[in-house]
Amino acid sequence: MKKARETDGSMEPPKSPSRLTLRGLDWLNFLLADVRTGVGPFLAIYLAGYKWDEERVGLALTVGGIAGILTQTPAGALVDFLRSKRALVAVGVAALAAGALLIALFPSFWPLMGAQVLIGGTSSIFIPAICAMSLGIVGHAAFDTRQGRNQTFNSAGNVAAAVLMGLLGYLVSNRSIFFFVVALAVPTILILLLIKPAEIDYQLARGANDGEKGGKAESVWVLFRDRPLVIFLTCAVMFHFANAAMLPLLGELLAKGQGRSSMLFMSACVVTTQFVITLLSSWSGRKAGTWGRKPLLLIAFGVLPIRGILYTLTSNTELLVAIQVLDGIGAGIFGVVSVLVIADLTRGTGRFKLTLGAITTAVGIGASLSQVIAGGIVHRVGSHAGFLFLAAVASAAFAILYFLMPETRNLRLAKE
């Protein structure tokens, strides 16, 4: 592990990917966001129209989430192992479309549970596969900027999907959203053809150094004995534990006395967050290469407790929506910089996507626990107590990051 980090970035030859491949990556991020967004957020409303009660809707959503958590680490390992990243993404998109079609045609219990397992399981492929292709195409030197650009197009796709599919549900039917996802899978798969496989360096794509052709990947257990990686894992889990329940709690707050308009305000919250993420993502990628990773992470972690406290200070709907700007700042920075930190810490190990998948699994578990624990606090004590509890966890995460986490941008150059 130490030796890998001492490898000078100058040993990696400069990458010169074609414009067509880079545009293909851009639009793949945009379209994948559309496909993935179309299945999740509208499912509860769709099932309610078929007289599903809250318990069964909650079970359906939980099954998909559990499938995603359980497959994150295997998906990362699979991406590291397979050379054909494009084919893997294509299979994932096709499987997701099949799940959406199953939901649209058979909105009964068992078919829908099967569809949720299929969708949750295959969705785990996309993030590590996109990161792998990006790293293999542009190399470590340009990965900061590329990851920021990926997140920008992903967030723009999320905004477009939220608006377009909301209009489809309003003007046509909720069911039409899932048919649209199926149709959207076709251009998403076709856009993969723009990405030239010859421009994806397999060794770089799995996090090895250039020139280590056929090198053996380090054991994942060795990686997780690495102190900075364990510290970052702890911080990431706490960040998502503090963050995951805030928007659902806000939704309950907005629903009080708002009637049907509560859905409109919730949509405004989502669009506000994604718009800020879109603006910040490219900036975060650029600044991560000059400022370093830690200063940006401190900003992301710092706004989270402030956001939790602000929710307790007002009941004004417009102000509550405006506070979502802080959500966009935190998510926009963390979404870009967290991947860069993992790339820094696993460089030369050949375990980039496996580690990314393992951390995403842990983060998913933390987010799930957030919903349960914060929900219990709100039920017994009230929403203000729930927000303050989450703010306290976020403050603890900030303290651990500030005092214990090293800067990772040049960590591989240090003589340890």
Predicted regions, residues:
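Helix-loop boundary and gating motifs at the non-cytosolic
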Residues: 12-65, 230-231, 235, 240-254
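Cytoplasmic helix-loop-helix junction between adjacent transmembrane helices
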Residues: 117-154, 341
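C-terminal membrane-cytosol helix-exit motif in multi-pass small-molecule transporters
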Residues: 183-205, 397-405
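Structural signature of the two symmetry-related core transmembrane helices
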Residues: 87-101, 182, 295-309
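Interfacial helix-cap and linker-helix signal at transmembrane-aqueous boundaries
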Residues: 47-48, 78-79, 167-172, 254-255, ...
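Helix-to-loop junctions at the C-terminal end of transmembrane segments
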Residues: 71-84, 169, 280-292, 378
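A membrane-interface helix-boundary motif in multi-pass transporters
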Residues: 170-183, 376-394
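Juxtamembrane intracellular "pre-TM" segments in multi-pass secondary transporters
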Residues: 5-22, 199-232, 416
